[in-house]
């Protein structure tokens, strides 16, 4: 496997309308810790979605789904491995940035991966670390508040 593309993705006009109602640079976008191939990719690969998000978003924050070399849920780590990508927060960040250049302003990693941020390849990235495991609703609310 060399890549994974969803070719039938199509824009939802209601989403376009909602984004346009907000005005330019009036929203913050958080890309949750979802599978970049099966969850985020089909959305970001919709024609013109990237340019629309960059035009409308004040900032885009992406949360890594990889913690300590594994995905907490789902096949993201398996897909990364099959594509020959390093299964790490750093590997995810570099792949996302290559696939969706200039989309993400701030990268959020779990504190377990903080040491990876010292890589020369990542020096120009705004990487923040915190506990990203949302084990209950109260922790999820705290994390959401921290993100915003």
Model-derived features: positions:
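Internal active-site segments that recognize and position negatively charged phosphoryl groups
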Residues: 1-51
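Alpha-helix C-terminal capping/helix-to-coil transition sites in glycosyltransferase folds
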Residues: 25-26, 55, 103
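Structural motif
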Residues: 28-31, 59, 106
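Short beta-strand segments
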Residues: 32-34, 63-64, 108-110
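Short glycine-rich anion-binding loops that position phosphate/pyrophosphate groups of nucleotides
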Residues: 35-39, 66, 113
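Redox- and metal-dependent alpha/beta enzyme cores, enriched for Fe-S-associated oxidoreductases
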Residues: 42-86
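C-terminal functional extensions of proteins
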Residues: 72-148
